[in-house]
Amino acid sequence: MVNYLSLKNNISSNLFSGHNNINQEPICVGDYIRFGLLITEGTKERTQNCEGLVIAKRFSNTCCNLTVRTVFQGIGVERTISLFSPKISKIKILKHYKVRRAKLYYLRRKENVKKK
């Protein structure tokens, strides 16, 4: 008989073996984070630092997607990132806000939501 639990652990360890974001502190909705995004321009590769408030967190079988919102030049910008993507070089939690909702979509209607 096949041991499905060990098979599942083996597959998940192979899937996430190259990811550097796997062993870090947990990211929750309401965290103000800064993440480095690897961008390839021609033959050069550079890291673009972005920061914002996590307004949503979605799970699927093998990945976790975060929706990060920031205000840039008076315009709200949202970016959806995959937590275990190889394009994410680093993630740092700058501040944790205590929230009572799982999704903070109501912040889209607020005008001046900034880091306090």
UniProtKB/Swiss-Prot annotation:
It comes from the Eukaryota. The keyword Ligase does not apply. One of its GO terms (cellular component) is mitochondrial large ribosomal subunit. Belongs to the bacterial ribosomal protein bL19 family. GO terms for molecular function: structural constituent of ribosome. InterPro entries: Ribosomal_bL19, Ribosomal_bL19_CS, Ribosomal_bL19_sf, Translation_prot_SH3-like_sf. It is found in: Plastid, Chloroplast. One of its GO terms (biological process) is translation. Pfam families: Ribosomal_L19. PROSITE patterns: RIBOSOMAL_L19. Keywords: Chloroplast, Plastid, Ribonucleoprotein, Ribosomal protein. This is Large ribosomal subunit protein bL19c. It comes from Cyanidium caldarium.
